[in-house]
């Protein structure tokens, strides 16, 4: 997704052959924490070696005409001198109510909300894309249209690899990127101390 010859809708990089639909096992919900976990079997693999770093939407279409999205971020290996756009996966997980409770509410409301979240389930928001289309996509299109040297990582990358933004000129957080781990926060603070600019577009 991004800006391609004044087309903000994106460009198709990959298409699979028709895939069989697999009957998956029933998802599990932890009765104590409310964690929803879909331990499903994969029936497809997407080759990423030839993909440019960036954010991709995978569109899944059925023979009946139904469709949904899945997110894919190809992380930039070298962000030196680049403006890094951070994709907020943890906030998507917090608001996701697919198959069970989110961090905000369950069947009864706030009292039986999930205390533990899993990314191993589809996303109920944005036709499967989470909050990306509303809060991140316009930012990506604007940055790429302006010719800014962009790079891409997720918030999980910041939490798990402090060097993922080493040498970046700036880090951009799109709207509503509100769920952080302590490790992510430390990574950003340390980068800021070393001179990396931090920019927040409505993230609280």
Enumerate the predicted regions with their spans.
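Aromatic-Pro/Gly-enriched surface loop or interdomain linker
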Residues: 1-25, 30-34, 55, 63-165
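Short alpha-helical segments and helix-capping/turn motifs at coil-helix boundaries
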Residues: 41-45, 57-59, 65-75, 183-187
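Short, hydrophobic beta-strand segments
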Residues: 17-20, 25, 38-52, 60
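Short alpha-beta junction capping motif
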Residues: 83-86, 165-204
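The substrate-binding groove and active-site-proximal loops of carbohydrate-active enzymes
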Residues: 44-47, 122-132, 169-182
